[in-house]
UniProtKB/Swiss-Prot annotation:
Subunit text: Monomer.
The keyword Transport is assigned to this record: yes
Lineage: Eukaryota, Amoebozoa, Evosea, Eumycetozoa, Dictyostelia
Protein name: Putative phosphatidylglycerol/phosphatidylinositol transfer protein DDB_G0282107
This protein's UniProt keywords: Glycoprotein, Lipid transport, Signal, Transport
Length: 147
């Protein structure tokens, strides 16, 4: 009887570990629409996993269907349910590697976020919404990572 109980507990632990590993295997999900101007193909983070006291770079690659002459990237980072970063950055700025207007084609773009030395360990989530010059959504990405 004791062996069956231990086997049951061991099986549950294996399932929980597998579920946790699967949950963080895919760090991103598109929250956009199929009609979005920028169709996201892939998102990666570097370093993976992120390290406290360093900058994490989040790279998104995809295909831009229409010309963009302006707009913003709205960034929201949460620790659990607590919002810790909320900022808006212009798509057309001096530090953007793609001068505006941005022509249709395949692109990779990154956002760098400094992680403080004292950032608590745990699950972080990010939401990145890109809008064009008319404030219409052109892409949306949700990112999950463990620190």
């Amino acid at each position: 009887m004791k062996q069956k109980l231990l086997l049951f507990i061991f099986s549950i632990l294996i399932l929980l570990i597998a579920a946790e590993a699967k949950m963080f295997k895919d760090i991103w999900k598109s929250c956009g629409k199929s009609t979005d101007t920028f169709q996201i193909k892939n998102v990666t983070i570097s370093p993976d996993p992120p390290v406290r006291g360093q900058t994490v770079s989040i790279y998104a690659s995809g295909e831009l269907k229409d010309t963009i002459s302006g707009g913003d990237v709205n960034i929201q980072i949460k620790f659990g349910i607590i919002t810790i970063i909320r900022e808006t950055k212009p798509i057309c700025s001096s530090d953007n590697p793609f001068p505006c207007p941005i022509q249709p084609g395949d692109y990779t773009h990154s956002v760098d976020i400094a992680i403080p030395d004292n950032a608590p360990r745990g699950k972080y989530s990010g939401n990145f919404v890109l809008t064009d010059q008319a404030n219409d959504e052109i892409a949306c990405i949700n990112v999950n990572m463990q620190l």
